[in-house]
């Protein structure tokens, strides 16, 4: 990931409860399957020693860049991947048993505030609606291309 992204504005939800529920051990292996801006990931990684590992996955390249900057120097491995591809990611990196997995599903404040993503009702911008902007068609193109019946099926 190249250019330095702007800092995240997203605040992780229920941070104390998440950490408590994961029962983190210093040498454990944990997965944040929706790592986003790295809020929960930073809390998890701060409790790991060099033998521990946090594996962070996200579809959003900009979120991964923010997370990479935020977690620099911590025992973290990041992957541009959807959490449904976790088995393949784990097979590639050949790690031991996973001690805990976190999925914080939904949109982040960063995605809502990015007018180029089209997730917000408060801003006017292109109707993209993709978490992974490197894959698939933006919504505006689908709307132009598909017949109304197909759009109704999607919605």
Predicted ranges, named:
Residues 1-155:
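S-adenosyl-L-methionine-dependent methyltransferase catalytic core, i.e., the SAM/SAH-binding region
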